[in-house]
Amino acid sequence: MSSLQALCSGLPLRPLPENRGRQAGVPHAPVRTPSLSPVEKQLALRNALRYFPPDVQELLAPEFAQELQLYGHIYMYRFCPDIEMRAYPIEQYPCQTKVAAAIMHMIMNNLDPAVAQFPQELVTYGGNGQVFSNWAQFWLTMFYLSKMTEEQTLVMYSGHPLGLFPSSRSAPRLVITNGMVIPNYSSRTEYEKLFALGVTMYGQMTAGSYCYIGPQGIVHGTVLTVLNAARRYLGIEDLAGKVFVTSGLGGMSGAQAKAAVIVGCIGVIAEVDKAALEKRHRQGWLMEVTDSLDRCIQRLREARKKKEVLSLGYHGNVVALWERLVHELDTTGECLVDLGSDQTSCHNPFNGGYYPVQLSFTEAQSLMASNPAVFKDLVQESLRRQVSAINRLAEEKFFFWDYGNAFLLEAQRAGADVEKKGAGRTEFRYPSYVQHIMGDIFSQGFGPFRWVCTSGDPQDLAVTDELATSVLEEAIADGVKVSVKLQYMDNIRWIREAARHRLVVGSQARILYSDQKGRVAIAVAINQAIACRRIKAPVVLSRDHHDVSGTDSPFRETSNIYDGSAFCADMAVQNFVGDACRGATWVALHNGGGVGWGEVINGGFGLVLDGTPEAEGRARLMLSWDVSNGVARRCWSGNQKAYEIICQTMQENSTLVVTLPHKVEDERVLQQALQL
């Protein structure tokens, strides 16, 4: 087995590693269908071989060509390392600077088989969220990071390490762009071709920015979403006996089972992939499993009657589950579900993100490769059936929301009945969770802040949990607005229960929805704890791209922006640049993420705290911008909560000066001017 020293020594060429092919017993990505011409196939092969010297090209060319033919992409399976892939303690990485070792720690966590969805295809989550495009890129990146100094920056072009370039000590050590395609060519069809050629890739959000922390990363947001959905739709705080039905137990969607237990409801989650379902069950994220609809309904009724807390995984298609719930309603008059959503990977519906109810899992995988056009028709028919069932249940006291996975967008494209009469382009019959729930949370500056303890020691994580709890309790004691206090209280509950619910999968990480003040205060507290050796090693700060400022996405993060700018990406791009100039250790900008390729621009960062005063200064400056940018934009769009928060922030910081909007008080002024 390789060592970390060997892993950082560059591409293994003399001798070449044994070609072991695809590993049995681990999940693999669906076959891609890029429809390359003979000339384009030659180009894809030529592009792959340029990583290797001429003396090995003749040997590698046939196997790379076979991968392209069989799987629609050249992953270079021969170069999949035989080391145990996981986030090793930072001290074990060979490096010239500890920040580079921290980045290597994060990269290997994204590829840990316990974390990654399709580890051999370098996919972390979402069906196609790549860390790299091929294994040669992984080896080169690890080599560059091990050699990098504080006066160099590693530049990443869609998985490809362009090289180390001279820069200043204050510059980012790593700058990542993923999928930056000219807008006119940012279509799904073009993507399949460009990815097969090896010239671009879909990094999802935290997959391609090396900041994924396992399904915990979305558990907290799901907890907040379900809690606030119950408050808004059901008018309750206690979810005992309430039923939440949804789909997906993958890298992100797997969080739904754990979130259901944390909020105290009955979560029924459908999943077509048995491997994904069993993985969550083994990890303790899913309490029970069944492949019988009869048993599923029976168990749901029992738990509902006894007000049990339950996460039940149904191995089957969610459309069958929705239609069975309609059957129960029509035959017994009883609506067995209170809340519902969907977390299939609908951003990628025709290549494994959504499986049609008419086919088994294996039949669907075969058809999507052999006849993509027929497969697409079946997917769209299945979407129409799913929406029809949801619409019937919604006639009762049942509430559904879109989880920002492009479900309603794809349903609309399929011809399903999701239209909201008189609505704008970003509105449907059912709201997105941003429009009704998370949007106001973002507008107050709260979002999925996170940190990773690079020592790999659970005790370090426990210390950070204590520090974060103290920060939030002190903030409440100092006095905050009622709406902000509610968020803080939810977060204190989360942090106290996090360890009990065994949320860590992979690196020793924690997510916490926090606002600007909270993020800065937590960062300062952690940095001081590192300085006094209470925490043993550096801590990486980051966040999901799905945040206050990180993402422009008209069907998710910015779907509650109604001034017409929901389709504009200035905020996300400015955030990427602004983080880079204010002290981020690394920054990333992506096309796609969440809703899908061509639908989103998003970015993220990593910031390494090492206990120095300089690290504290960078954290204060960068985290303040990273939140205020989005609050200011949301304020300008007309959001009242954002207006109040940015005004308060300006009062607290005299160097912050934001342009504030003036409301049109009398709508008749517009009508008269336009002669309407």
Curated annotation (Swiss-Prot):
One of its GO terms (biological process) is L-histidine catabolic process. InterPro entries: Urocanase (IPR055351), Urocanase-like (IPR023637), Urocanase_C (IPR035401), Urocanase_central_sf (IPR038364), Urocanase_CS (IPR023636), Urocanase_N (IPR035400), Urocanase_Rossmann-like (IPR035085), Urocanase_sf (IPR036190). Residues 15-35 are annotated as: Disordered. Changing R450C: In UROCD; loss of activity. This is Urocanate hydratase. It is linked to Urocanase deficiency: An inborn error of histidine metabolism resulting in urocanic aciduria and neurological manifestations including intellectual disability, ataxia, episodic aggressive behavior or exaggerated affection-seeking. Pathway: Amino-acid degradation; L-histidine degradation into L-glutamate; N-formimidoyl-L-glutamate from L-histidine: step 2/3. Its EC number is 4.2.1.49. It catalyses: 4-imidazolone-5-propanoate = trans-urocanate + H2O. Gene3D superfamilies: Urocanase like domains, Urocanase superfamily. GO terms for cellular component: cytosol. NCBIfam families: PRK05414.1 (NF003820). It comes from the Eukaryota. Pfam families: Urocanase, Urocanase_C, Urocanase_N. Belongs to the urocanase family. Its cofactor is NAD(+). NAD(+) binds at residues 126-127, 204, 251-253, 271, 317-318, 343-347, 354-355, 403, 594. PANTHER family: UROCANATE HYDRATASE (PTHR12216:SF3). Keywords: Disease variant, Histidine metabolism, Lyase, NAD. One of its GO terms (molecular function) is urocanate hydratase activity. The keyword Phosphoprotein does not apply. It is an enzyme of class 4 (lyase).
